């Protein structure tokens, strides 16, 4: 007989660590713009592994069994009680398992049974993952990985999760592990690797790191912050957002080197287009501070260079100014509407 222990039936489970919760709780938004001119070298990132706090908590499953003769248990997780829509099937020799990367704000059902036996009589329990923001993702070998979804918008709609992820690169300064590859393919169901790094970071003979997993690689080079106003990068940002309007590319993963500056700029503009509040746009940028590449703060001179560019556009919010910027660089209204229809 197998008896389920945890999560408790009906429990709500948070995947945020205490450090992540404290970081969010301690943000002050009385002052969205800062006058300090602290610098960040986005092309000379330094790793500090002691500062790695971007990984989420797993959901911990535990059970007991009085059957000592069998080796393998099967943990099955689904979004429906009849298990017609399973999301995980995990073989476990111990009476416990740690599961990462479940969606936030969703009810799940779970059961455990002995391998090669019918699960029909297995006990079924449910739990709900908290609607934590952000939805941090664990990809072994990478850092600063999170879902661009879950945020609320001014329209009252929540940005859909499971479509676009952001994070660090998979090669060079990082090396995604086999377990990380498995998560990208089987947890995130990734279709597209959107690489926004420059040509100097992509060497001759480069083989896309996820090529062997059947994930399409696309390179659209951009530069961050105030560079968004230069003609060459206006063209590149137009290409990037036009690419995002294709629903067939999702789920997709956007990255530069550390998922901080170039990725932070693209994410800021996307969040603005979708209607995120000024406070949430600032918070999303600063959340990179939880990763290994040091703090990202609103008082960085380069970040304020970007805001100064956006200030030249009409509107009372970053959402309005960011949308006006995208229109000005040539992203068509139908393209912007297509992106909104995908994410909202």
Spans of features found by a protein language model:
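Cys-dependent protein tyrosine phosphatase-like superfamily
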Residues: 1-253, 265-344
